[in-house]
């Protein structure tokens, strides 16, 4: 499945699968790169970028493409999904080398979750590295217990390993201890490379299970912000999560946008502690992804028009939203006088297919509440759900 990778200068050799676009034109600039901002726009296709830039030549995305270097034939790993895709970007590996095929897989060597006495236990376990790991998968803070959600989510810990329910983890038969996501990964990450060089690292993603990006050391990311995207949204008790309504997805992405802006300004993700701008940091956007998946949301049709290339009204709005946030990042970098030392990497963990709506067959889904979903069963996006709400979301 083709994904988009927009780049200019490859600042770190470990970034083998991604590319970057400098904030300012740098053809004559030999300033050393000190900061790399990696942005994954989940669901973004090469054709989306071409369409958007052609129709919005003065946009922030157009500026990145114009001033940077574009790799138009990049491919996502197979299988193509968020977990293996993100791991691929920060390791340069594919599932056969990283050991990460999917966030829900079968392992023939590990023991079932919850095993405490490992003698004579038959190996074989479903490894579920998604929202099921959260101490409270229905809470935006994954069970931390913050009092003022969703508005206070930036107070969420930057060490989400503490929010993982160890009884949901597979067990190593050799040690009889739970295997955290970072221990499941077979290779190191760019975050670990940076840490070994004495550099600061940060990242924002959608589940606590993304502590996998810490790498085998478990310490690759110093500030990891992981608000739970499949939690009840926008407030506790809601029958939907942040993916069931595109305006809610934008609101969710805004929390991560603010975290990155805080980091550009030299603070931790919460904006409370002055720690310096990270050497490697970034986030993933979900807004484009849900705009492609949802048949309709906020009174707008999702996906593409009949040509399979032109974004429909919901997806067009999502692309404008992402462009606006990229513009904010670029401006913040300039405001901090970091534009001569920063590279922006615009990419995607995965795309989505088919783009042609005539080739898409939707499977009807139940409209049951997420609260009634038993633990151990993956929640299903209730794509048939819709309601009238504002079509704008402020970051």
State the predicted function of each range.
Residues 56, 72, 79-81, 100-159, ...:
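Secreted, luminal/periplasmic, and some membrane-associated catalytic domains
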Residues 138-173, 178-239:
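Catalytic-site neighborhoods of secreted/periplasmic enzymes
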Residues 207-208, 212-230, 268-321, 358-360:
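Active-site His/acidic residue clusters
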Residues 49-99, 200-202:
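Short, structured active-site-proximal loop/turn typified by the sulfatase FGly-forming signature C/S-X-P-X-R
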Residues 91-104, 202, 218-267, 304-324, ...:
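Acidic, His- and aromatic-enriched active-site or binding-groove loops in soluble protein domains
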Residues 8-18:
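Bacterial N-terminal signal peptides
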Residues 33-46, 63-65, 89, 194, ...:
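Beta-strand elements within well-structured catalytic alpha/beta cores of enzymes
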Residues 17-30:
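C-terminal region of N-terminal signal peptides and the immediate post-cleavage residues
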């Amino acid at each position: 499945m083709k994904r988009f990778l927009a780049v200019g200068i490859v600042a770190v050799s470990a970034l083998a699968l991604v590319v970057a676009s400098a904030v300012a034109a740098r053809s004559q600039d030999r300033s050393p790169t000190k900061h790399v901002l990696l942005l994954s726009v989940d669901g973004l296709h090469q054709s989306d970028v071409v369409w958007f830039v052609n129709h919005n030549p003065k946009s922030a995305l157009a500026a990145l493409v114009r001033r940077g270097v574009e790799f138009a034939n990049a491919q996502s790993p197979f299988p193509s999904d968020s977990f293996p895709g993100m791991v691929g970007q920060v390791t340069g590996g594919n599932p056969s080398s990283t050991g990460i095929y999917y966030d829900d897989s079968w392992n023939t060597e590990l023991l079932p979750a919850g095993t405490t006495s490992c003698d004579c236990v038959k190996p074989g376990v479903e490894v579920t590295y998604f929202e099921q790991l959260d101490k409270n998968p229905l809470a935006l803070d994954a069970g931390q217990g913050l009092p003022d959600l969703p508005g206070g989510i930036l107070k969420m810990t930057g060490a989400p390993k503490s929010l993982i329910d160890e009884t949901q983890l597979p067990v190593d038969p050799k040690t009889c201890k739970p295997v955290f996501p970072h221990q499941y990964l077979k290779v190191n990450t760019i975050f670990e490379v940076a840490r070994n060089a004495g550099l600061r690292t940060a990242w924002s993603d959608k589940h606590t299970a993304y502590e996998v990006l810490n790498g085998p050391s478990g310490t690759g990311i110093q500030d990891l912000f992981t608000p739970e995207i499949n939690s009840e949204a926008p407030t506790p008790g809601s029958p939907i999560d942040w993916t069931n309504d595109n305006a809610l997805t934008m609101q969710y992405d805004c929390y991560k946008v603010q975290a990155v802006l805080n980091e550009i300004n030299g603070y931790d993700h919460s904006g409370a502690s002055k720690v310096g701008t990270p050497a490697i940091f970034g986030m993933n956007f979900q807004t484009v992804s849900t705009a492609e998946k949802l048949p309709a949301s906020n009174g707008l049709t999702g996906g593409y028009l009949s040509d399979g290339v032109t974004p429909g009204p919901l997806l067009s709005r999502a692309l404008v939203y992402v462009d606006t946030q990229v513009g904010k990042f670029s401006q913040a970098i300039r405001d901090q006088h970091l534009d001569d030392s920063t590279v922006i990497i615009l990419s995607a963990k995965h795309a989505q297919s088919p783009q042609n709506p005539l080739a898409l067959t939707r499977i009807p889904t139940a409209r049951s509440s997420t609260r009634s979903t038993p633990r151990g069963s993956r929640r299903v996006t209730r794509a048939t759900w819709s309601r009238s709400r504002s079509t704008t979301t402020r970051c």
